[in-house]
Amino acid sequence: WYGHNPIRVVLDRTLSLPNDSQIFDGNVPTFIFTEKEQPEKKNITYITINFNHNPLKQIMEALYQRKIQSLLVEGGRQLLQSFIDNELWDEAYIEKCPSRLHSGVKAPQMDDNFSYSIEEHFERQIWHYVRRL
């Protein structure tokens, strides 16, 4: 993607990320969603939400209020599955490899009801681009 650095959106329920993490460098506007109130710092805005009461809805509403209309989600299985289950996605890039892993975390599960789907092969990897119905 070309253009300016995107606004970083971080979920840190208990503010457990190390203070020396790059996300705290202040170089890029950053929103941190947390349960703990915290004063703003240079380019860092802390947004307090209740993680026990539909946190994704609160996050999406807070981003909408700040006129953010596009969100690229990178995360682990639980976060990605939550976005999928709550139908909070329009398109997805899925990378698959034919190699079998015998342990680890399973990938998020999606149904196959896509309005649009492309599959491309790169050496041993398969890339899927899909849009939701």
Predicted regions and their residues:
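Enzymes that bind and transform nitrogen-containing heteroaromatic metabolites
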Residues: W1-L133
